[in-house]
Amino acid sequence: MLEKTCLEEKLDQQCSNVDNIKHTNVDIFKNESNSTVVSIPPKHSIRARKPSLHFLHSFASSGSLTYKNALRHKSCKLHLHKCKNPKKKYRQSGFRLASKGIPRSRCSKKAKKYLEDKKLMPISEVSLDPVISSNPLLRWWATSASNDSLLEELNNRFEQITNAWVQVSKDEAQNFVHKTEYTKGDHCEAASPLETCLLELEVSPVKMLFQKKYNLNELCTWFMQTTETQSLSLVRKANARNPLEVISTKGIKLGVKCCGFNASPFRKHFKKFAVSSPSKPAGKFHILHKMVGSPLLNVKSNLTLARLKRTEFKNLHCERWRREERPYSHRTVDWSSKRRNLRLFCQNPSWTNSEGQTNAETSLNGKGTVGNQWASPPEPRVTFAKKRVAVHDFRTHASLESKFNGTGGGQTDSEKEQIMESVSSHNWRSKTLKDCRIFLRKINCLEHRNTFKLNTIIYSPESVDSGGSQAQPEESKRFSLRSHSARQNSFKKQNEERANPKANSPASSRLTGELDSSHLSKHVNFDKNPDHSEALSKLSKRKRPPWKTTEMSAKRHKRQSCNSGQMANYCTKSQVGKLFSPSF
């Protein structure tokens, strides 16, 4: 619609321009009739005012089919009208000039000049011919024409084209042969080799296509049958594909047996195109997961699964078995879960509070604090009975401490037991106990080597030197837990104390007598034997096994750190068992 409106506007502009030219010419001739001198306009201005033939040709050919005929008629009318106008004007001007009594010679001269000027403009001669010739071969159909009429006209044209071709049917070929023989007999014409070749063709394929109705499917089938469409690259890609994607497992019989992957029909293709074949295609595992629950898995002689049953299918079955077994299995926890539990164990506020309270309580017992050493047992599993024994041992030691320390110690021990029981009853399980053992084993690198005596306690020099009534009962209580080097040091210090009778009290002498009767009778009686230095040297010169030497070096390191005042807090095995024991 926009094109139509534009064309109409252009035509109106051209027509208005032509009318303006007419009016200007009429006014000029009127003025000339009034005046004696005829003013003829210049050539270029007149040519510029008139529409050009190139514009009309392009304008007529650019429109739609329905508007071409209208443009052709309009262009013809315009040119004919322009040709008639100058003739009429010339006659009118000549008639007016003659009527006014102007001499004939002057009129004739002016008329000749005007005609010469008009001869320079050939548009009047060209405009007589139409812009678009009405050729009967070119036919334009309107948009309202039906499809049936168009098909009929097309069929007629195809028939005309086919009739113009050389006929190659049998009857026509025989007639053509007779004609050639007749011409040869007369020796007038000779048969051309092209015509003899046409005789050999019975039916032309192009003629066959145009004689029948147009059908795209027939053309496609004919093209696919008569041409080579598969290239080498397509065949190579098809061979390099995964057999799981190409072959469907539905049509495989159960009785078919395959020797193996090396004897399979795909072996040569995988060897030939090993670079182009993908190692792990995208849809491979998706197909395998779909086929896990199918009955074809039980068939060991499957063609497509012969190669995959060694690796992928075993893994898939193992995954299924693990998923089914996981809620019923009672196996050890992974190290990641242990680390997670250990982190929670270290961040637990109840554990930190209990640890601070135990350290405070041990500091109240005397000037020298008994170190709390975290000792991890070497065995991976500790039964419930062992935990109870450790807790009972801790309680007996706590009762002994309360006897010698007085009422304050008893109160602290009772508070400690209540706190420990609350912690153990609410917060600890067997898993956390195992995780804590692993954690303690990694922290205590020195105690990790000591697999025999993990419950040893080394006293600080202040606690050993204290001559009160608290240190000696603790020594009598925990004397059996000391190592050999610690015993030697304690014997030396006890002998020094006995040599000074002023410093020793009667209670301490009684306790030392009990200690001599109970513990020192097995080794050497240092009170009766004056040569105690010789006995100590003999004990030190004994031959020790290699594990004992490593243990002694560790103990020596601890003793040096204890003497320098850098000893860390330690706790015994019984205390650790008390902390992690479940509620009774």
From Swiss-Prot:
The lineage of its organism: Eukaryota, Metazoa, Chordata, Craniata, Vertebrata. It holds the Pfam family DUF4553. This is Putative uncharacterized protein ENSP00000382790 homolog. Residues 353-379, 400-426, 463-565 are annotated as: Disordered. Transmembrane segments: none annotated. It comes from the Eukaryota. Residues 353-375, 502-511 have a biased composition (Polar residues). InterPro entries: DUF4553 (IPR028104). Residues 516-535 have a biased composition (Basic and acidic residues).
